[in-house]
């Protein structure tokens, strides 16, 4: 197939259906952009989860007998419990907080409660870092109910609740992207049908002189793929602009406090090839299926 003829057919088809082409480009850009946004949220959540997992601690609160009478964990009950915990293979480090230390630590984190919280409200505790914070349930189950243990609090569960919000946002973005993708598929199918119909006479003549089915249908596929590629590029540029003009300013205070991982240009560029591939593949598969179904001769 001559490249010049093929290029001319593609340009002619796009020009004839300019309104539908623009609609398809915009719909593809929106759906791919939303999908890319969902991927960035997933990447943000994964990177931020790594930050928090490095800080995750398990707190073993001790009974009132130890809290009231043992300031340095020297009683037999406290020493036995500490030795049992430190002997575990999954424990990375352990430190003891007596009641005064627990009160000071709480007031340092929440100074607004200084006038309402009494020292007796805070039990002594062990602050423990596990070798693998994700696998904390075995430790919790083994420690809970031991002599001297009041309760066990694992921050991993609190972090999971926090990131459930981010996971929910990414799910919403993916659902909206799916709806937009369905719209893009319908537009691609309609565009290919209209393009084939408007050139039915030319196609008929070409088939009469021996042109293959693939030869006559390839321009329609390329039209859809070109439009989808433009839409995907617009989506990628949109993500870069959104990162520069919106995300960086909106999330800067969270970045400074090291509460969430940064969304860098590298993250956008990381997902960009997948977005481009998705747009082209979506157009190619839809166009091919449409031609197989509606253009049978």
UniProtKB/Swiss-Prot annotation:
Keyword Transmembrane helix: yes
Gene3D superfamilies: 3.30.70.3040
GO annotation (BP), single: cell division
TM region(s), chain numbering: 22-42, 172-192, 220-240, 268-288
Membrane protein topology class: Multi-pass membrane protein
Pfam families: FtsX, FtsX_ECD
CC annotations in GO: plasma membrane
Extracellular side: 43-171, 241-267
Record's keyword annotation contains Transferase: no
Entries under InterPro entries matching the protein: ABC3_permease_C, FtsX, FtsX_actino, FtsX_ECD
Keywords, ordered alphabetically: Cell cycle, Cell division, Cell membrane, Membrane, Transmembrane, Transmembrane helix
Localization per record: Cell membrane
Chain ranges on the Cytoplasmic side, renumbered to this chain: 1-21, 193-219, 289-297
Subunit structure: Forms a membrane-associated complex with FtsE.
PANTHER family hit by this protein: CELL DIVISION PROTEIN FTSX (PTHR47755:SF1)
Purpose of the protein: Part of the ABC transporter FtsEX involved in cellular division.
Record family assignment: Belongs to the ABC-4 integral membrane protein family. FtsX subfamily.
Protein name: Cell division protein FtsX
Annotated organism of origin: Mycobacterium leprae (strain TN)
Gene name of the record: ftsX
């Amino acid at each position: 197939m001559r490249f010049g003829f093929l290029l001319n057919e593609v340009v002619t088809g796009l020009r004839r259906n300019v309104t539908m082409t623009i609609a398809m480009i915009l719909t593809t850009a929106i759906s791919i952009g939303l999908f890319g946004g969902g991927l960035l949220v997933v990447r943000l959540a994964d990177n931020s989860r790594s930050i928090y997992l490095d800080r995750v601690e398990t707190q073993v609160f001790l009974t009132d007998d130890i809290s009231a009478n043992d300031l340095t964990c020297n009683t037999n009950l406290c020493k036995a419990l500490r030795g049992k915990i430190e002997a575990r293979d999954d424990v990375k480090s352990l430190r003891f907080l007596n009641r005064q230390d627990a009160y000071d630590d709480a007031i340092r984190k929440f100074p607004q409660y200084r006038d309402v919280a009494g020292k007796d409200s805070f039990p002594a505790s062990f602050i423990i870092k596990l070798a693998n914070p994700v696998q904390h349930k075995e430790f919790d189950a083994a420690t809970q109910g031991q002599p001297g243990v009041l309760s066990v609090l694992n921050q991993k569960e609190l972090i999971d609740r926090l990131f459930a919000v981010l996971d929910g946002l990414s799910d919403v973005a993916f659902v909206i992207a799916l709806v937009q993708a369905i719209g893009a598929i319908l537009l691609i199918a309609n565009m290919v049908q209209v393009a084939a119909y408007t050139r039915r006479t030319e196609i008929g003549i070409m088939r009469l002189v021996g042109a293959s089915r693939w030869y006559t249908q390839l321009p329609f596929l390329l039209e859809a793929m070109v439009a989808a590629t433009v839409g995907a590029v617009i989506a990628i540029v949109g993500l870069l602009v959104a990162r520069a003009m919106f995300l960086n300013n909106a999330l800067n205070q969270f970045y400074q406090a090291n509460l969430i991982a940064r969304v860098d240009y590298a993250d956008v560029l990381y997902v960009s090839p997948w977005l481009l591939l998705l747009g082209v593949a979506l157009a190619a598969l839809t166009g091919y299926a449409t031609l197989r179904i509606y253009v049978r001769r």
